[in-house]
Amino acid sequence: MDMGRVILGASTVSAVVLAVGLGVAITPGGGLTTDVQGGGICGTFPDDSTPVSTWFMTSFRNDTGHGIRVRDVRPAELHRVTLTHLSIATDPDASSPGLVVTDDADRPAEYGRTVPVDSGYVVPAHGELDVVGRLVLRDDADAGRLHGVVVTTVGPLGTLQSVTDPGSFGIGIGTGHAESDIGCDGA
């Protein structure tokens, strides 16, 4: 009888230790973060301009001491714009602007080389993830915006973690646009 209790007690202790160990292994230990609290940046073209487009870049920081694999990057919301390009900039210039208002379809040179968002890119320990994209204003709109960029990463044991940059990137024609239309004040 005493031997049975010893075996049962040892089994219980082992199960608890394994459960705690598994919980520690799959609990997120930090990841990507962003300093953006909201708001946005935008630009406008003169009245009667066509086509109207903009390039944008936003950054996420890896606060951990290990690399983090990116699984996916996507817009949270699109309002009257089309996202024609989205990629990861592997080494942008330090002076790269967050928004380049241009009708040029070519990516700005300051953004440097890019890789696809689903390439399995690994954000180095204490490094940055820079996401670049191109927005084109729809023909039937005078202002539009992207609100939020969502990055999904792969954590321990294949767990998925997502972080959202809540900022807006907007583009418009003319002036006097509501913030809800273009994503920033005063445009």
Q: Over which residues does each language-model region extend?
A:
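Non-catalytic macromolecular-recognition regions in eukaryotic signaling proteins
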Residues: 2-187
